[in-house]
């Protein structure tokens, strides 16, 4: 290795170490009030660090999937940074018609068969409720986030946000039952901050949904007669 290259490495190494040391983590605990006003772990709650610029940088490499499988969407909750593209493969041996009437992103991917896939890009942060125009039991939620550091709470309601720059960090959360949360955390360099989030999901009810035409779904029938 040349002396010049060695000097460059010598200059860059302290910088890399300093940047690594400056990052910390946020340990999040989420609880949600259920219909009986009991606090239960917020399993599946999406939490993230707000950083729109980082979201834009991460978007080109973000291509999560929401698959149609066994007349269900898998996963039920997915996450993508704003500007990212989501894949919607059909893994069933029947047709599906993925659509959304959400204000954040209205779209209709049309009918497509087994083995085919469609894609959709999402620009506006917020939850997007996704359905199938043929099968009313199919429902998913895509959470479009304005950040690049995110996690979903486990069955115990805990999540860890890692590699967070030291200093003040704005954290947001979204839960299907309990709605939204925004808070500010002071992240220590090389250390961990704790954040407890309490959400009220006591009023949550699955009210069902209409088809893409805003009408009730027809009675269930054999899939072969649907199209």
Where are these regions (language model features)?
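Extracytoplasmic copper-binding redox domains, predominantly the cupredoxin/blue-copper superfamily
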Residues: 23-227
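Bacterial N-terminal signal peptides that target proteins for export
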Residues: 1-11
């Amino acid at each position: 290795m040349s002396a010049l290259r060695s000097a460059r490495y010598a200059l860059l190494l302290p910088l890399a170490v300093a940047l690594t040391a400056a990052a910390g983590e946020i340990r999040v605990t989420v609880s949600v009030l259920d219909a009986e006003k009991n606090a239960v772990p917020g399993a599946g709650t999406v939490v993230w660090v707000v950083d729109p610029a980082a979201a834009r940088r991460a978007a080109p490499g973000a291509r999560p999937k929401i698959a149609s499988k066994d007349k269900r969407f898998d996963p039920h909750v997915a996450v993508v940074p704003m500007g990212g593209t989501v894949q919607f493969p059909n893994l069933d041996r029947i047709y599906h018609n993925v659509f959304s009437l959400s204000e954040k992103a209205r779209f209709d991917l049309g009918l497509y068969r087994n083995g085919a896939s469609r894609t959709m890009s999402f620009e506006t942060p917020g939850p997007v409720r996704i359905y199938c125009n043929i099968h009313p039991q199919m429902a998913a939620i895509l959470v479009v986030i304005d950040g690049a550091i995110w996690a979903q709470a486990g069955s115990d309601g805990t999540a860890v946000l890692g590699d967070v720059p030291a200093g003040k960090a704005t954290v947001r959360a979204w839960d299907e039952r309990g709605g939204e949360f925004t808070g500010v955390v002071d992240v220590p360099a090389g250390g961990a901050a704790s954040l407890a989030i309490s959400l009220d999901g006591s009023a949550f009810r699955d009210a069902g949904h209409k088809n893409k035409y805003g009408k009730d779904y027809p009675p269930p029938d054999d899939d072969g007669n649907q199209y």
